[in-house]
Amino acid sequence: MAKKALLIGINYPGTAVELRGCVNDVHRMQKCLIELYGFANKDIVIMIDTDKSCIQPTGKNICDELDNLIASGQSGDFLVFHYSGHGTRIPPGIEDSEDPTGFDECITPCDMNLIKDQQFREMVSRVKEGCQLTIISDSCHSGGLIQEVKEQIGESHMKPVDKVKEQIEESHMKQPKLGIASYFLNIVMNLLATCGVSKSQRDRGGGEESFRGEIELEKDETLDIKTRYLPFESYLSLLKEQTGQTNIEPVRIRQTLLKLFGEDPSPNRQRGLSDLGNCEVDAGDSGASRLNAVTDNGILLSGCQTDQRSEDVYVTRTGKAYGAFSDAIQMILSAPRKDKKKITNKELVSEARVFLKKRGYSQRPGLYCHDRFVDKPFICY
């Protein structure tokens, strides 16, 4: 039985969307895997963008290393892929109109070569029978990052219109005497929520400040909060900077990515990129019948839902920086358990939700996997 891991942290140093806690998340997870789960340091690959001696977390390098990790796994092995960095989402192509989240969720490598949920699905579907791959993604819009895997905890597999309807009905049940103005205000606020604008972010104002904020704590301590969300305009700006291409058209972003990066991925991933032509969203069948049909050996723990943002936290007094979800995981795993049993995937995600809610975060972690993994111990047995 082998235990292997690929840990990726991207801070995007020197850019307008720089983060502070992603690389720290990687080092904390590395320590956790070694001390709590018996991983050998030689079997952990680290990719960070703050140390040039490390393999740089470009789109191609991430895909290559994840391919290597999956190819090396045999029956009885436990594999871990941890990602901390920016995330984004784009409308699906015509071939993905049945995506139950209604969007293509992506992670954002340091070279802006997006890795989409279909690519994760294709790679994870190659995990061998009897081998288990656990993916932890502390990034915005990470709910549903592996396409077509069953949602066990979360609300990402609902179409936006269904989410609005559910939220309005729930609000009406709690406050049945709302006036007409308040009723329609609720509709507007819930529509904003489906676009990834949470209440806490709306409260912080618009523009750049819409994904930054501060929380005052006791003893003159302040948390500087920045979400791990890369606005499309910022993504385009960084893409132009990274590639030297100044004439990138937003409406042709998929074709542009294929042109810029299509030669880098493997043939299978090239196919995934070549399908990025049409940006229509189909609100039809959720494709639930396909869930569990593929990627049976992959488990995803997401930092938030597909329409939410994961927080990057900086403690001004101590200088500590971390992802809110990554911190929740570490705090929960390090706490003694009364029953002395190993924490399960379901328990970890459920407890992380409570942990974050108590601390004022709006993000809700999710669990995506086959039914048989829900109550299995986190990472390994």
Curated annotation (Swiss-Prot):
GO terms, biological process: hydrogen peroxide-mediated programmed cell death; programmed cell death; proteolysis; response to hydrogen peroxide; response to oxidative stress; response to UV-C
Keywords: Autocatalytic cleavage, Hydrolase, Protease, S-nitrosylation, Thiol protease
Gene3D superfamilies: 3.40.50.12660
Active site, renumbered: 86, 140
Any one GO molecular-function label of the UniProt entry: cysteine-type endopeptidase activity
Induction: By UV-C light, hydrogen peroxide and methyl viologen.
Residues with S-nitrosocysteine modification: 140
EC assignment: 3.4.22.-
Annotated InterPro entries: Metacaspase, Pept_C14_caspase
UniProt PTM: Proteolytically processed; by an autocatalytic mechanism.
Enzyme's top EC category: hydrolase
pH dependence comment: Optimum pH is 7.5-8.5 with t-butoxycarbonyl-GRR-aminomethylcoumarin as substrate.
Coiled-coil segments on the chain, per record: none
Its biological purpose: Cysteine protease that cleaves specifically after arginine residues. Does not cleave caspase-specific substrates. May be involved in the modulation of programmed cell death activated by oxidative stress.
Family: Belongs to the peptidase C14B family.
Name of the protein described by the UniProt record: Metacaspase-8
Lineage: Eukaryota, Viridiplantae, Streptophyta, Embryophyta, Tracheophyta
